[in-house]
């Protein structure tokens, strides 16, 4: 009887050793879950809706405030308003309505999207509602925001919304192009911040290296 038990132990020993070796050296690494994207919120704490319209308003007040609006670019001979501006103060006209067009699904932080002025317009000017970034402006030594973009066009019409550490959001321009085509896209994700420059007394949205425009989104 003892001899049989001894032989049985000898037979089971390789299995135990193999099992121990497999357990210690061949652990299966399960993929870690990616963090869920955070939705962009409006001034009431509601998630932005692609089917709704919003005003882009500045966090600042008085001369530091002012809504974003569609206006005529100085010296432009185009048939339609084609510039993206910000009013000089939060006291005065309200901004032009916009809607956000994500690549798919909802509107989330740090996700590519298009921005469109959501206004009634004549057929001739329909294409002058989509935001884009223009060519390098020699006078300002930067690239100005204008309209005439194309939904889904990566080179000039893609933007992102990113959350500030304390309150509000920044807008980023994020093309999918070689770096030399966007010398201002310097962060790790190849994006540039949107701020303002003064053009003929108006605040024109443009790409900036510092002092980006801090904004909120107000549903209308």
UniProtKB/Swiss-Prot annotation:
The keyword Methyltransferase does not apply. CDD domains: beta-trefoil_STI_CPI-like. InterPro entries: Kunitz_inhibitor_STI-like_sf, Prot_inh_Kunz-lg. Transmembrane segments: none annotated. Disulfide bonds join 80-125, 174-185. The record marks 99-100 as: Reactive bond for trypsin. Its main location: other. Glycans are attached at residue 51. One of its GO terms (molecular function) is aspartic-type endopeptidase inhibitor activity. Residues 1-23 form the signal peptide. Residues 24-32 form a propeptide. It comes from the Eukaryota. Inhibitor of cathepsin D (aspartic protease). May also inhibit trypsin and chymotrypsin (serine proteases). Protects the plant by inhibiting proteases of invading organisms. This is Aspartic protease inhibitor 2. It comes from Solanum tuberosum (Potato). The lineage of its organism: Eukaryota, Viridiplantae, Streptophyta, Embryophyta, Tracheophyta.
């Amino acid at each position: 009887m003892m001899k049989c038990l001894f032989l049985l132990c000898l037979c089971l020993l390789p299995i135990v050793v193999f099992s121990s070796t497999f357990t210690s050296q061949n652990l299966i690494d399960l993929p870690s879950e990616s963090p869920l994207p955070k939705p962009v919120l409006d001034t009431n704490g509601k998630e932005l809706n692609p089917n709704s319209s919003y005003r882009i308003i500045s966090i600042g007040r008085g001369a530091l405030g002012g809504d974003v609006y569609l206006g005529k670019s100085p010296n432009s001979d185009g048939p339609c308003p084609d510039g993206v501006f910000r009013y000089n103060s939060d006291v005065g006209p309200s901004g032009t309505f916009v809607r956000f067009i994500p690549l798919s699904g909802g509107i989330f932080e740090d996700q590519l999207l298009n921005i469109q002025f959501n206004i009634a317009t004549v057929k001739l000017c329909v294409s002058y509602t989509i935001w884009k970034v223009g060519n390098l402006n020699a006078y300002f030594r930067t690239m100005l925001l204008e309209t005439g973009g194309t939904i889904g066009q990566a080179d000039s019409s893609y933007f992102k919304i990113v959350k500030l550490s304390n309150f509000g959001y920044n807008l980023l321009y994020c093309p999918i192009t070689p770096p030399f085509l966007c010398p201002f896209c310097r962060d790790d994700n190849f994006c540039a911040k949107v701020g303002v420059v003064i053009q003929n007394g108006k605040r024109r949205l443009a790409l900036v290296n510092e002092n980006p425009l801090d904004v909120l989104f107000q549903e209308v």
